[in-house]
């Protein structure tokens, strides 16, 4: 009789151990899935995030010059300086100096229509490699060059002015702009950098995991 009881108890312990191991494996799998989800969010880069050189679960980006972007949880721009830039009535409200963002067939911001001038963007994957902006009596072209870490290292800024002189109708100037990064946040997004020693600072907030 004691042998039967011992066998029964051993079977119970074995079943209990298997159940605990199964639960432990399920818990570990769930933990791994959650960790991967958090890693994916930390490294996520949408076209809209790439537009402002950022990645991760970004909620807001505020530049010291006053521009503020708000993103949804999917990484899409919701508002720019408090309004929807994809439906903005630029010419209907010229006094507000609004900007209207236009997308290309892949969903990238390819043109910003302003009350004064327009800017056209050229992309290579998820990087902006060039923009062309109309300025008073001329045109400005900026070409970006990226380093191994995916950050802009320098830009070539070419400006063409109409001089209205018969012998030299166009004046062209070229300036190399060197980017240096001073501070990064916990998501490795830059928060302070200089362009030819001129500082730019921004504050970034993030969505908390659900």
Task: Name the predicted role of every residue range.
Residues 12-15:
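C-terminal motif of bacterial Sec signal peptides marking the signal peptidase cleavage site
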Residues 18-210:
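Buried hydrophobic residues that stabilize the cores of well-folded domains
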Residues 1-5:
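Sec-dependent N-terminal signal peptides
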């Amino acid at each position: 009789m004691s042998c039967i009881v011992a066998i029964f108890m051993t079977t119970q312990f074995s079943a209990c151990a298997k159940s605990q191991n199964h639960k432990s494996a399920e818990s570990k799998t769930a933990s791994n899935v959650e960790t991967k989800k958090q890693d994916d969010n930390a490294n996520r880069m949408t076209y809209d995030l790439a537009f402002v050189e950022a990645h991760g679960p970004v909620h807001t980006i505020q530049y010291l010059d006053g521009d503020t972007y708000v993103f949804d949880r999917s990484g899409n721009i919701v508002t720019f300086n408090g309004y929807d830039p994809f439906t903005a009535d630029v010419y209907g409200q010229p006094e507000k100096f609004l900007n209207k963002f236009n997308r290309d067939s892949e969903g990238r911001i390819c043109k910003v229509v302003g009350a004064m001038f327009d800017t056209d963007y050229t992309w290579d994957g998820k990087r902006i490699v060039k923009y062309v902006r109309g300025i008073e009596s001329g045109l400005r072209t900026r070409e970006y060059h990226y380093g191994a870490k995916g950050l802009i290292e320098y830009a070539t800024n070419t400006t063409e002015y109409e001089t209205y002189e018969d012998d030299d109708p166009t004046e062209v100037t070229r300036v190399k702009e060197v980017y240096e990064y001073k501070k990064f946040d916990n998501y490795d997004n830059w928060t302070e950098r200089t362009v030819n020693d001129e500082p730019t600072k921004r504050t970034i907030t993030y969505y908390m995991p659900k």
